[in-house]
């Protein structure tokens, strides 16, 4: 494709020409896929809906075929989600079908939310901020939820879909929509995944911190971006929201043990095996709100390709296309924390980790620029981690690590 480096639009219509691509630190696009077809029909509530189907040339109507439902972000469209992900490319390789529905109104999904906080928060924000839909009745009654169920049924009637291998993935508001669907209608899914915009924790737990769930276990993938922020009406911190979203599905899926972790370039993985289902957390370094272009491929290769449900609705696992990229040797620390992650286990540091910032202030009129940030832990803890002998001099002001380091 021809990359339009001057584009500054959220969803440029120019992408429809089948030649243009865009490249941004939140969303990267592919050329508009030739097999992507638009459809319109009344699916529920006498409302005409729009969706886009992608059927790869390798589709065999004689074979049971997996289905992926991919949900676009707020103010986007189904075709926008198709070009901003690699789902169609993975479908070409694997032979499954992908459907990209449009939200019914304002390009925004009907979502559970605390409406009073939404109104109060948006009143404090300047600029042309679109208003969420006011939720009415129960989640199962939302048109976007009902029509998605009907769309899946329609796809099963039209194609030879494997009912045990239906998956959903979404980006941003589409991630929140996917999470909502997974919690209330997830019994028809084997797995769900999303990038950006985790769910407000107040929608996940009741007042006794019991999970709110009508669907039961299913395999879950959560992609989180380092430079992302949760919506302001959540009224909770970014890390708090991410932690509770992870905790929620760990409880539902019976993931009681410590995860196995893997670090690949700017991607940090935590793999959780559960008694009822598996969870994957992918943390992306130096990434803004959105989804990485290869997010779909990673979700399929490491998770969706290895989970399915039987006719009774019970979740099962087989070997995924790629084995989990677990590091046997790993070491991680966090600011102000006394615990360190060492070789997929936890050890206690002698004092908490702290960070020191290298700054430049000369010639900046009293301001400063952070040029580097460095983690510090006790040398004695390093000696313990790497099974080395610690030698100190000058009352501890000088320390040596003696002997060859041993890993594991």
Identify the role of each PLM range:
Residues 1-67, 93, 140, 144, ...:
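A domain-start/cap signature at the N-terminus of enzymes
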Residues 38, 42-52, 64-161:
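Serine-hydrolase catalytic machinery in alpha/beta-hydrolase-like enzymes
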Residues 65, 78-81, 85, 138-146, ...:
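Soluble non-cytosolic domains of exported or imported proteins
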Residues 69-71, 195, 284:
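Alpha/beta-hydrolase
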Residues 77-80, 107-111, 178, 201-206, ...:
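Extracytoplasmic/secreted cell-surface and envelope-processing proteins
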Residues 156-158, 163-216:
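Primarily recognizes the serine-hydrolase "nucleophile elbow" in alpha/beta-hydrolase
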Residues 190-276:
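The feature captures the conserved acid-bearing segment of alpha/beta-hydrolase catalytic domains
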Residues 305-408:
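Primary recognition of N-terminal secretory signal peptides and signal-anchoring hydrophobic helices
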